[in-house]
Amino acid sequence: MLSIRNFTYLLFLTLGLTVCGTPLAAQLGSSSGAVTGAVLDPSGAVVANATVEIHNPVSGFIRSTPTDSSGKFSFNNVPFNPYHLSVTAAGFASYAQDVDVRSSVPLSVEISLQVAGSTTTVTVESGTDLLETETSAHTDVDRALFDKLPLESQSSSVSSLVTLASPGVVADSNGLFHGLGDHAENSFSVDGQPITDQQSKVFSNQIPVDSIQSLEVVSGAPPAEFGDKTSLVIKVTTRSGLGQKQPTGSLTTSYGSFGTVTSDANLALGSDHWGNFISASGMNTGRFLDPPEFQVMHSKGNEENLFDRMDFQPSVADSVHLNLGYTRSWFQTPNSFDAQFANQDQRAQIQTYNVAPTWSHLFSPTTLLTVGAFLRHDNFGYFPSANPFADLPETLSQSRQLTNAGLRTDLSYVKGMHNLKAGVTFEHTLLTENFSFGVTDPGLNAVCLNGNGTPDTNPTPTDPAQCTGTLQPNPGFVPALLAIDRTRGGTNFPFHGHGDIRQLAMYVQDAITKGNWTFNLGVRGDLYRGLSRDAQIQPRLGLAYKVNPSNTVLRLSYARVMETPFNENLVFASQTTNDPVISGLFGANSNAAIRPGARNEFHAGFQQAFAKFLVVDADYMWKYTHNGYDFSTLLNTPIFFPIAWHNSKIDGASVRVSMPEHHGLTAFVLMGHVNARFFPPQVGGLGTDLGAGGLPFRIDHDQKFQQTTHLQYQPWKSGPWIGFNWRYDSGLVAGAVPFASDTTTPVDLTGLTADQQMQAGLFCGNVFPTLSSPLTTCAPSQYGSTRISLPAPGAESDDHNPPRIAPRHLFDLSVGDDNLFRGDKYKWSLRATAINLSNKVALYNFLSTFSGTHFVTPRTLTAELGFHF
């Protein structure tokens, strides 16, 4: 059998010979195509200076260009989608047709105009450009549409954009989102570069939203070219300067609540043969991360971004494209009242750089070869307080690095009914994990208990035999943790780990169009060699049928997916119990290294267009996974690590209703519902007590219903505009809150601190906790919460009726004018944005196993001034 090493050498050799044997190349991305052609008059003569426009009314993409002296036109960097193409020229009748961009192979059209007044007309089928005869559900969003969306966070704008624009996506804290019932099983494909690691701002730095031209969010069965993490595949097409003969750009600055200041600069310039787009931005804010209190304490942060895309096209057949990126973020860990009183001062810094060159060669009008390489590096540092005893209940320092390097190549062939693509991707990921932590709370692992059952914080006893008088031995005492108990003379526990992960993927897929039918046939093979080993063959199948009389598309799809383990702290999660401290923390029977999961997923859906005014896209999915992934934490520290459950069953519906621009009004409505059930036992990662009873449970990213409504109105093209969002979330699972087991037994609340009780909004009758007076017990009939939906006494079920975060309605508003002084070449813009307009006090989560407690953003006001040229 061919090893990964030998295959890689062979692959590099083959690609090298290919490069040497063909002309040098330049710009056709794996996530975009090109539309080229010529405009002729009835005699066959060229028509110069005709205006050619392509437009997708659903995504908002629109672009126009004049024909040159030879009547030719070209649109580069066009996202995969159907488009309405129109041509106008003086003295000629208007022309229109629909074109479908589905491959990186350029689409060539030849247009013959009729003389004005001719009886010959061109007709276009009503509603055609609203529909896509595609087998997988997806959402397309162009910059023209999302530029006016009120986005919540400058430091995680991409997450906010995906959450607000895609159905089936559940919002979580700190830029995290859950796609279709899974925990962060999302991947990005940036101009064809795969990024499958978490992009939450506590793990990594996201690409800047200024760099994005368009998004396609695939929520249906993934095509064969995508693997690893596929609940959502977010295909990003970045902005380009190719063909931009007149330099364009912008300078913007903003100021808002919490002292937030941002500055952004963008520039695009180029010619027919080269182009450059560069973006630089910076932000400083008093609320970088979502805090555990509605009141913001110790949450300052800043971020700097630099993105550069360079394109070079020396010939019609060749193109080269290079993406460069660097982002640095520094931020404080927000404090709770408990941490603030202790003067806790924990901070973190993340540095990310990315280099991704791509070369494309067009062998013929039907065949395109693309070769790409990529190198992405994350360097994460976590820093404790200067006084370690200010960090409660543990003190922690961490240095974590992730380097992902790889090579990808694909061959696209488009002819007749076939749209064929085959490719190979090799990735090598290096993990380095260094951290140390020590216990700083004398009550966390107390040797003795007082007579009333509370922990004895006296540091002197180090053996249960020393518990004398009114003291009694603590049955929960773990002797192995004495070595890291700083309050009893211990020292920090050090961990140093390294991981080496190699992955090889090969795929072939063919989208076959025959009449009103589309068939998607594909197969993917993955070879995973990391801390565990696996190999899987994964068929991908889909079909779609367009019902012309009713403007309806019906679709079915199936995918087998090999899910690879999360890389964040994977080395630590794969430790055995040879170390007494790890054994003391997680038990003597911790699990083996996490293996890749195996998933079968099924989708059924439809699209329905109503003339040119409305399109409804609905999808229902069923996902069955062996080795279902989630995350756990090291005590109460920000060291998160992956775990695996025996299996999971997830099903749910996603709906998007889109209204393209009509008399200045644009709107869309997103709706989603999911059931996310996980089944013990735990089969991978360090131990946890969740699901210890052997019964299924709802994971904490299960949510019954969420919806987003966006309205955008601009009465005339150059006038002011308004954008409005309404977001409703029914609430994530909140399993850590106490509940009434029956109608008579008082609820024991001593497991929560007074601060935690206040965060949860708990009350007992008319009594609410204060920082100095926590609740201890409460009769079931008097017990309740203002921020968490508690099951009725005796009705709690981890599977069917768990506690949940209370439902919330959030409203956002933006108003602006993109051309204040009605300039032509130079324009000034002004906009004002309000996030959480009603200042709703609500939780994202409460004592989540993965992320802890976080509140949604309070009312945030921002004003932005921009200069555009």
What are the language-model segments listed below?
Residues 2-3, 7-10, 15-139, 152, ...:
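Periplasm-facing N-terminal accessory domains of Gram-negative outer-membrane beta-barrel systems
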Residues 92-114, 118-223, 228, 233, ...:
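Periplasmic N-terminal accessory/gating domains of Gram-negative outer-membrane beta-barrel systems
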Residues 727-792, 805-810, 817-869:
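C-terminal beta-signal and adjacent terminal beta-strands/loops
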Residues 513-518, 620-624, 642-738:
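Gram-negative outer-membrane beta-barrel transporters
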Residues 370-374, 380-382, 546, 591-644, ...:
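Membrane-embedded beta-barrel scaffold of Gram-negative outer-membrane proteins
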Residues 330-337, 379, 531, 545, ...:
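Surface-exposed extracellular loop regions of Gram-negative outer-membrane beta-barrel proteins
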Residues 255-284, 294-331, 347-369, 539, ...:
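Transmembrane beta-barrel wall of Gram-negative outer-membrane proteins
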